[in-house]
Regions:
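Contiguous beta-strand/loop segments that form the cofactor/metal-binding neighborhood of enzyme cores
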Residues: 2-54, 58-199
């Protein structure tokens, strides 16, 4: 799940001038050559269909990586459905800020939810589920696992009693930098294919 309260990206009339230090043609790459129609060029691209896919692709791929590792699936799900929309305000954003995605893996379903609005209108406070707002939860017959950060996993029984905790060996950002510096892909903790499958 990805429950991150995201404010409106604003609603501008017409188009905006691209900063003179930006080669906009290079920035766009293969995307359609359209005028800039949002306030922040360098971050709000996440919410435009030509360049991004909202929090599903911005934050969600990290949680889906972890969920797939639990499933043991090294492939794209054979079937997927999604429902959602851009709710709560009218702005220049296009991609969904509220969305549920169902991956129909053979092992077990992987369900991902995006909530880009606060838990109470205007509060900006993140909603939570089982103590997590950006997390992975694995439901099993005799209990469940919670991954609420990138450094640990807690295991609970069906009465929500914590029975075990595992600590990780470090963050993946540092590992990526280390692999770039060594120029050795074998230094990566995970193959690049992992990110591709989740995205």
């Amino acid at each position: 799940l990805c429950y991150k309260s995201r404010p409106s990206i604003g609603d501008i009339d017409g188009s905006k001038d691209v900063p003179s230090e930006i080669d906009y043609n290079l920035w766009l790459g293969p995307a359609p050559k359209k005028p800039l129609t949002r306030n922040r060029l360098h971050y709000d691209w996440h919410w435009m269909w030509d360049y991004g896919n909202g929090d599903l692709g911005n934050q969600g791929i990290h949680q889906m990586d972890i969920a797939r590792w639990f499933l043991g699936d090294m492939e794209v799900s054979p079937r997927v459905w999604s429902i959602g929309g851009r709710l709560g305000y009218v702005d220049d954003g296009e991609s969904a800020n509220t969305q549920v995605i169902y991956h129909d893996y053979e092992t077990a379903p992987l369900i991902f939810e995006v909530r880009g609005l606060g838990d109470v209108k205007g509060s900006g406070k993140r909603p939570t589920y089982r103590g997590g707002s950006v997390a992975v939860f694995v439901e099993c017959e005799k209990g469940w696992a919670a991954i609420r950060n990138y450094g640990s996993v807690q295991i609970y029984d069906n009465d929500d009693k914590k029975i075990k905790e595992f600590k990780g060996g470090g963050d993946h950002f540092g590992n990526f930098i280390q692999a770039v510096r060594s120029r050795n892909p074998k230094d990566l903790n995970a193959e690049i294919l992992e990110g591709h499958l989740s995205s």
